[in-house]
Amino acid sequence: MNQRRSESRPGNHRLQAYAEPGKGDSGGAGPLSGSARRGRGGGGAIRVRRPCWSGGAGRGGGPAWAVRLPTVTAGWTWPALRTLSSLRAGPSEPHSPGRRPPRAGRPLCQADPQPGKAARRSLEPDPAQTGPRPARAAGMSEARKGPDEAEESQYDSGIESLRSLRSLPESTSAPASGPSDGSPQPCTHPPGPVKEPQEKEDADGERADSTYGSSSLTYTLSLLGGPEAEDPAPRLPLPHVGALSPQQLEALTYISEDGDTLVHLAVIHEAPAVLLCCLALLPQEVLDIQNNLYQTALHLAVHLDQPGAVRALVLKGASRALQDRHGDTALHVACQRQHLACARCLLEGRPEPGRGTSHSLDLQLQNWQGLACLHIATLQKNQPLMELLLRNGADIDVQEGTSGKTALHLAVETQERGLVQFLLQAGAQVDARMLNGCTPLHLAAGRGLMGISSTLCKAGADSLLRNVEDETPQDLTEESLVLLPFDDLKISGKLLLCTD
């Protein structure tokens, strides 16, 4: 008679274990010997019946329970021990796409209690119960192989089972053989630290990450303060952030589909607390990451007129010399959008001439249109911004890259006499030449700007200078008397007055 032991489990499950005595076994349900597995000796076979899951939510559903079997001895092979560990881990998760789902009821491991006959351990549904069949536990294919054929790592539907298999140290020897008293013993893992499986990589070497491409800022920011979740593989910590969890490191190094880092997103969504957290934890190199439009977080902070964010980024060491797709630095953007407060923050702490670094600000740097910051401020007719730039060392006579105009030429083109007077008082060269040889007086005379022409003449402009077309300012004006540098001319005793 077979000895039958039955234990009830929660959720209408029943675990039945039968001990079948084999040849050479005198004590009923004794331990399996090594020869019994190979069919050359006696021993008993253990058969485990696992009923169908009732009340489970789909495939892989149902409560997890631990298998209790007689004490494991040396007769058990490592594939069998790994299979028991996978059973202890509970039901497996759904299979990954592209893999054929396993069929329930196939043998987990085989042992021969008698020569020519094999004892089978299988999972079979209980006919008295109905419900979805559970997926085959992980490690079944490995249990069917011999010790020499077992692969070191297998990927199937059972992620939890894979972890339990990896938690078994390969160098650990099999348990010592000894008599079994037949009492149920819990099947537990060998002692030792549990190692997490490493992430799978594709053929191109890119990391397969389930959160890749997520554009949700709320989910990303929640990882910074939420509870630590289990990460599939350990990651190397960034410099100076070794105390962070892998989940927090992943959130801090998040990059969206547009190339925006968490620092970019904190500026865009006006989240100063998150920005300060990033500045405190991340190294300076992360702050200079450019998105798909070649914009740094400093560019965006200036665009959105956030002086506090600009000051914090500058103090952290963010580069002020990086250019976007238009060749504009953050200061170019501040001049274009006339954000005076942001421009002040960018110019704070600027190193002395000749002592700058690669991250220092070059006020003479031109964008792809050939315009320096002073040129842009002049075209915007923003005199306070022009004063700020000149006070911080901007070259007043720097020429733009397309035609060689200076700020004074551009001020004449804006027809703002006040800007012309301001630049002349600041020391602008009154006879600065363009690439075609024209001076500011050529431009004023050719446009018929009599008031600006008079201002230039009073400042010492030469009305006889010729351009490449051999023209003087007097040749370009109809009223040549206006270009004379005198203000006390009299005709018939009457004072000649120059009016705008």
From Swiss-Prot:
Highest taxon listed in the record's lineage: Eukaryota
Lineage of the species this protein comes from: Eukaryota, Metazoa, Chordata, Craniata, Vertebrata
Subunit architecture: Interacts with RELA, REL, NFKB1 nuclear factor NF-kappa-B p50 subunit and NFKB2 nuclear factor NF-kappa-B p52 subunit. Interacts with HNRNPA2B1; the interaction may be mediated by the RRM2 domain of HNRNPA2B1, and HNRNPA2B1 may interact simultaneously with FAM76B and either NFKBIA or NFKBIE to form a complex.
Protein family per UniProt: Belongs to the NF-kappa-B inhibitor family.
Keywords: ANK repeat, Cytoplasm, Phosphoprotein, Repeat
Name of the molecule in the record: NF-kappa-B inhibitor epsilon
Basic and acidic residues bias spans: 1-10, 196-209
GO cellular component: cytoplasm; cytosol; fibrillar center; nucleoplasm
SUPFAM superfamilies, alphabetized: Ankyrin repeat (SSF48403)
Gene that produces this protein: NFKBIE
Residue stretches of each ANK repeat: 258-291, 293-322, 326-355, 369-398, 403-432, 436-465
Low complexity bias: start-end ranges: 161-186
Tissue specificity note: Highly expressed in spleen, testis and lung, followed by kidney, pancreas, heart, placenta and brain. Also expressed in granulocytes and macrophages.
SMART domains reported for this sequence: ANK
Organism of this sequence: Homo sapiens (Human)
Post-translational modification: Serine phosphorylated; followed by proteasome-dependent degradation.
PROSITE patterns (UniProt xref): ANK_REP_REGION (PS50297), ANK_REPEAT (PS50088)
Main location (coarse class): cytoplasm
Physiological role: Sequesters NF-kappa-B transcription factor complexes in the cytoplasm, thereby inhibiting their activity. Sequestered complexes include NFKB1-RELA (p50-p65) and NFKB1-REL (p50-c-Rel) complexes. Limits B-cell activation in response to pathogens, and also plays an important role in B-cell development.
Subcellular location: Cytoplasm
Pfam family, one: Ank_2
InterPro entries assigned: Ankyrin_rpt, Ankyrin_rpt-contain_sf, NF-kappa-B_inhibitor
